[in-house]
Amino acid sequence: MIAAQPFNFPYDGRLVPASTALLVIDLQEDFLSNTGYFARSGYDPTPLRAILPTVNRLMKHARAAGIQVIHTRQGYRGDLADMTPYEKWRRQRAGLDGTDVLLRSSPGFQLVSDLDVSPEDIIVDKTCNSAFTYTDLEHILRARGITHLLFSGCTTDVCVHTTLREACDRNFQCLTIADACASGDAYAHAAALHMVTVENGIFGALADADAVIAGLAAL
């Protein structure tokens, strides 16, 4: 059991490591570096880099408890074959046309070196805000009998929250770890976290990393 709001997680008190995964969303060079997509779009990546120690600590305790760690990476094919006209237009509008930003063939696509990725971790590549759209994430989760998801990563208001909403609609039990998520927009970050708890937890529950680690230690 993990102390959380508006209810302790999971709601029925049965937290089973083999049925639980820690999702680490998009902690890539393109989002966290000073020269990547996020910075070139006018956002400060400092808040995103700041969560790395917390995420690393969570991953360490999750693995020790027998919980699967799953990373996601956002990016497109090098030949842009999977990029829609609208996405190409947005890319051009942002001044990124002709660059390798957010392309899978670029260094920026890689997970940051300060992230403690382990060989047993699973990596899911995506092109959309949701890690479920056009990926094999749900198949991986169902194949492993995973029913409970712990959310971390960036950005809170876009890829984390979109994946969270889709997970809830797919009947996964979800917990968002507030201090293990980050955004370049403080208002959007706070709003996204607040939305988790409205209507008695319409998008699951919200906790901090210390509460999660304490709950895992008690298993």
Please provide the spans of the model-predicted regions.
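Generic enzyme active-site microenvironment
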Residues: V24, T72, I177
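Acidic-leg catalytic submotif of subtilisin-like serine proteases
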Residues: A21-F31
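A short, N-terminal amphipathic alpha-helix
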Residues: A50-Q68
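Short acidic/His/Gly/Ser-rich catalytic and metal-binding motifs that mark active-site loops
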Residues: D30-T35, L80-A81
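Active-site-adjacent betaalpha module
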Residues: M1-A21, K60-A65, D82-M83, R90-L219
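Active-site loop signature of alpha/beta-hydrolase-fold enzymes
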Residues: D30, R77, S183
